[in-house]
A protein has these predicted regions:
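Active-site YXXXK catalytic motif of short-chain dehydrogenase/reductase
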Residues: 71, 111, 115
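SDR active-site strand-loop-helix element
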Residues: 5, 29, 50-54, 89-95, ...
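Adenosine-cofactor binding site in Rossmann-like domains, unifying the SAM/SAH pocket
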Residues: 26-42
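NAD(P)H-binding glycine-rich loop region in Rossmannoid oxidoreductase-like domains
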Residues: 40-70, 99-101
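Conserved Rossmann-fold NAD(P)-dependent oxidoreductase catalytic core, especially the SDR/UDP-sugar
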Residues: 76-110, 133
């Protein structure tokens, strides 16, 4: 059995659909059912993999209690279960933890700080995991992210802008600058 968190989100939903298409036994968890699952799930011995994609991903969120509960505490709880039952885990971090440098973690907003907190926790417990893979996503895009509005990837925003106006404008005077968006 595979646990996938964040199944109402862009990446989690794609994991869920792909695994189901392959006939895998999947337990899907989103914010509506997360605390119920935490209190009631008791089949950890049957879990083969945890794919933890669930989080508040809004980089403009300033509700620290929510970020702490979802992005930090729930992630630590899942990681502890992965350690306790020696379940491999795939964890969604974020390239936003780097801030303005790639040399060290330097988060510039509360979302990035919440992700960096888990990255550090994982680093402190790395030898206890059977297997952990941390993915630091950056500007992920694709079908099904239209609902994200201002939080949609640059590629989605660019495509919409070009479709609507026939032009691409990043910001005032952007025709004089070069930008690299790794997608």
């Amino acid at each position: 059995m595979i646990i996938v968190t964040g199944t109402q989100g862009f990446i989690g939903r794609h994991f869920l659909n792909t695994l189901r298409d392959k006939g895998e036994d999947v337990i899907e968890i989103d914010q509506q059912g997360a605390w119920y699952f935490k209190s009631n799930f008791n089949k950890w011995e049957e879990v083969d993999l945890i794919i933890h994609q669930g989080a508040i991903t809004d980089t403009t969120c300033t509700i620290l209690k929510a970020l702490q509960a979802w992005n930090v505490e729930y992630s630590i709880w899942l990681c502890k279960k992965a350690i306790e039952y020696q379940i491999p885990i795939l964890y969604a971090s974020s390239a936003s933890v780097y801030g303005k440098t790639s040399d060290m973690i330097n988060p510039l907003n509360y979302y990035a700080l919440s992700k960096a907190t888990i990255d550090y926790w994982i680093q402190d417990h790395i030898d206890e995991f059977k297997l952990i893979q941390v993915f630091r996503y950056y500007n992920v895009y694709g079908t099904g992210e239209d609902h994200k509005g201002d939080q949609a990837s640059p590629v989605t925003k660019f495509a919409k802008q070009i479709k609507e106006t026939g032009k691409l404008k990043l910001f005032e005077g952007s025709d004089k600058f070069l930008r690299d968006f790794v997608c």
